[in-house]
Every structure is written in C-alpha cells, then in structure tokens.
Amino acid sequence: MITSQQMRAARALLGIDQRELAALAGVSLPTIQRMEASDGQVRGVVDTLMKVIAALEGAGIELIGENAQSTGTGRGIRLRTAVSD
C-alpha cells in the first residue's frame, strides 16, 4: 500500500510535519510516528492507512507503485535500485 519512506518523502514534498499530516488524515500524532518508524510497508488498520493515503493524495501527492507508470502530469522523482558498475 504505502511505505514509511513514501510517507516521509510525501511530507517533505508538501513541506508539512507529522503533526500536520495527522491533522489532515484525522488520526493521532503517535499513529503517524509509528507508521513512519516502521520498516518498509506500513502495517496497521486498513481504515487508518486509507485515511493517510487519502490525505496525501488530497494534498496533491501521487503515490506510484513499484514498476507502475505515473498517470499524473508535471515533473517528479522516483527512487530506483542503483546500477552496478
């Protein structure tokens, strides 16, 4: 669904802190802190995950799955595996 790295990157792009994301999503600050502290895929109550994703998307973030194409317009960034020499 969403990784902790995506959450942190999305917040950075929006220029908001964890408290602001919690308010946008209607969840508690400790919930956001736990989600971002997890390793890899965020696990938790599906309803809570959906609230966070909806808040990020509502603020203009496009979450792109692995090997998926972006449907949005404009410039963006994607993290990929480093190419070996």
Task: Tell what function each PLM region has.
Residues 27-44:
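Recognition helix of helix-turn-helix/homeodomain-like DNA-binding domains
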Residues 46-63:
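DNA major-groove recognition helix of helix-turn-helix/homeodomain DNA-binding modules
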Residues 24, 45, 69:
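Residue-level "edge-of-site" marker
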Residues 7-20, 81-82:
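Short basic helix-loop element that most often maps to the first helix and adjoining turn
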Residues 1-2:
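A detector for short, charged/polar N-terminal pre-domain segments
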Residues 58-85:
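Short, charged recognition helix plus adjacent turn
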Residues 6, 31-34, 76:
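Residue-level recognition of specific faces of alpha-helices
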Residues 10, 24, 35:
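Residues in the recognition helix of alpha-helical DNA-binding motifs
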